[in-house]
């Protein structure tokens, strides 16, 4: 159920992102989308340290993009559209209500699932973390780790190339 709600919020944020015009609001939506994606990754993998590292990497990339876009954009005032905010909240609540109306046993499953998670959380925490950390470096998931290493290296090269003193689009800081 939690996964379904997070995916719904990600979908709504994706639709809102297309309506944004200011770079600051786009960055905020992208940061929120990244946070929710990392949260969803942590729920699926059952350990949150990988999603924490992924979030820090994307946050570093977002800071670089923020500096780059801020140096190129004009100095216009940032205003929030309350119509868009209320519309997105309304869509979120309607979609959540729609999920509950479609499957009435979903509420019962949600409540029993929470009770079972509370019961089994203390018993299996240590053993599950050891098994899931071992699984991360085995064959299918080691490709994600290699992709992450390559992404970090590429981000490092692009950052060094962009921020050279006389070659980049950044304004000089006085």
Swiss-Prot record:
Q: Which reaction does it catalyse?
A: a ubiquinone + NADH + 5 H(+)(in) = a ubiquinol + NAD(+) + 4 H(+)(out)
> What compartments host this protein?
Mitochondrion membrane
Return the EC number: 7.1.1.2
A single Gene Ontology MF term assigned here is:
NADH dehydrogenase (ubiquinone) activity
Which stretches are transmembrane?
4-24, 25-45, 48-68, 82-102, 143-163
Q: Which UniProt keywords apply?
A: Electron transport, Membrane, Mitochondrion, NAD, Respiratory chain, Translocase, Transmembrane, Transmembrane helix, Transport, Ubiquinone
Topology of this chain in the membrane? Multi-pass membrane protein
Protein family according to the UniProt entry: Belongs to the complex I subunit 6 family.
Q: What does this protein do?
A: Core subunit of the mitochondrial membrane respiratory chain NADH dehydrogenase (Complex I) that is believed to belong to the minimal assembly required for catalysis. Complex I functions in the transfer of electrons from NADH to the respiratory chain. The immediate electron acceptor for the enzyme is believed to be ubiquinone.
Query: Matching PANTHER family, A to Z?
Result: NADH UBIQUINONE OXIDOREDUCTASE SUBUNIT ND6, NADH-UBIQUINONE OXIDOREDUCTASE CHAIN 6
Q: What protein name does the entry list?
A: NADH-ubiquinone oxidoreductase chain 6
């Amino acid at each position: 159920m939690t996964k379904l709600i997070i995916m719904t919020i990600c979908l709504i944020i994706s639709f809102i992102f297309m309506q944004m015009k200011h770079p600051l609001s786009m960055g905020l939506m992208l940061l929120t989308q990244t946070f929710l994606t990392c949260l969803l990754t942590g729920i699926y993998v059952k350990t949150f340290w990988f999603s924490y590292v992924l979030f820090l990497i994307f946050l570093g990339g977002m800071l670089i993009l923020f500096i780059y876009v801020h140096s190129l954009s004009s100095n216009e005032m940032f205003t929030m559209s309350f119509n868009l905010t209320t519309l997105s909240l309304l869509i979120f609540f309607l979609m959540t209500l729609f999920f509950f109306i479609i499957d009435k046993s979903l509420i019962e499953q949600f409540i029993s699932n929470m009770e079972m998670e509370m019961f089994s959380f203390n018993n299996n925490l240590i053993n599950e973390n050891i098994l899931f950390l071992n699984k991360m470096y085995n064959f299918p998931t080691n490709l994600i780790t290699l992709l992450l290493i390559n992404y970090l290296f590429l981000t490092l090269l692009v950052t060094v190339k962009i921020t050279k003193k006389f070659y980049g689009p950044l304004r000089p800081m006085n």
